[in-house]
Amino acid sequence: MKASAFVYPWDVVGDPGAAGRIAGLGVRQATLASAYHSTRALTPRHPRHRIVTAAHAAVLYPVDDARWEGRALRPYAAGEWAPGDAYGEAAGALAEAGLDVHTWVVLAHNSRMGAEHPSTSVVNAYGDRYAWAPCIAQADTRAYLVDLAVEAAVRPGALGTELESLGWYGLTHLHAHDKIGGVGLGDAGQYLMSLCFCAACRAGYGGHGLDADDLASAVREALEPVWRGDVPSEGGWPLVEKLLGGETAAATRVWREGVARSLQETVVAAVRAAAPTGFQVLLHADPVSYHCGANAGVDPGHILSVADGVVVPCTGGVGPLTPFAEQGRDAAVLAANFTVVSGMGGSPGTLADDAARAAAAGASELRLYHAGLASDGDLDAVRTVLTGPA
């Protein structure tokens, strides 16, 4: 089964041996970040540094100024963590090592944009703004995301792209010294806390028969027993319906899923129009369509009619593959994404068994997170699975 490893440009730039080491793992592809959010990343083998701090979301290549001239929303250039064309330099080294290179593009997740342009952010029913979560219902934000996807995905020499966060972002997000875990929200609470009440969403709810003020009040009322701990943290969509009312819950979902589907269709079409023939477009996806986050909630049948396939989180189990496999689209890529960094909850020692379970559940490829972050021991375990014992 084909495997690809996720990589950051700073893992490769300045380390002459990095590309060869990654190729030596037995992967055929490198999925290389070209647009990425803020992070603090370990580089345990780099000859010049051990910690890279990306201070804000940025593109990791020179911005095309002509594309963005006169626009308030535009990509930010990277700082010292990825100067110049860091993506291009890393991509060249990886290709020279014999790897196919695909871009890795993070889209609707940008805390700096939310700080500098607060009106772009998701606003919850209490009036709190989520700076990390651009509202994908807003016209200017959608236009920004489409052009960012085209520019960051179709880089010179790239054979395909993987689009992360192409959908709604909500409450869930690792934030600075995060302290919001005191109450277990579960799927239902997360959904209610992720409903947006910006001007665009308020109008959208109105188009589906909901008064936005009444809806916000209903959401706050529905959450009261959650804050008191009187509601189980699990329960999924049936609990959303119980807390908010079936018709109201359904109307919010129709609005939000329509917004996400149309954005996904528009972005994929724009990337394909800009890319050479055969360019592969995958989405990082969750088969539960009302979910938010890096793995966008999607309708499996719809997304496999739009994109060439999906990258599915499987570290916690391969169950999320099943709804995609059930669509019966033999040509679609179903990539099972496993964290192989032990210190981040991964289990590289069980990769062979995990991969076998993923294949049985319908996976056609593997994604391994992450070749730059993993320890030598973790990478040795991966290499053994992909290439056999030394």
Short names for language-model regions:
Residues 307-321, 337-390:
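Substrate-binding cleft of secreted/luminal carbohydrate-active enzymes
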Residues 4-6, 102-156:
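Active-site-adjacent "subsite" loops/lids of carbohydrate-active enzymes
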Residues 129-270, 285-287, 293-300:
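Polysaccharide-binding and catalytic clefts of secreted carbohydrate-active enzymes
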Residues 10-24, 139-152, 290-305, 321-322, ...:
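Short, acidic/polar
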Residues 4-12, 65-84, 128-143, 248-259, ...:
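The substrate-binding groove and active-site-proximal loops of carbohydrate-active enzymes
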Residues 171, 273-318:
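Substrate-binding cleft/loops of secretory-pathway carbohydrate-active enzymes
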Residues 31-56, 83-127, 160-170:
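Glycine-rich, aromatic-flanked loop segments that form ligand/cofactor-binding clefts
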Residues 16-43, 151-160, 300-313, 360-364:
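Catalytic domains of carbohydrate-active enzymes, especially glycoside hydrolases
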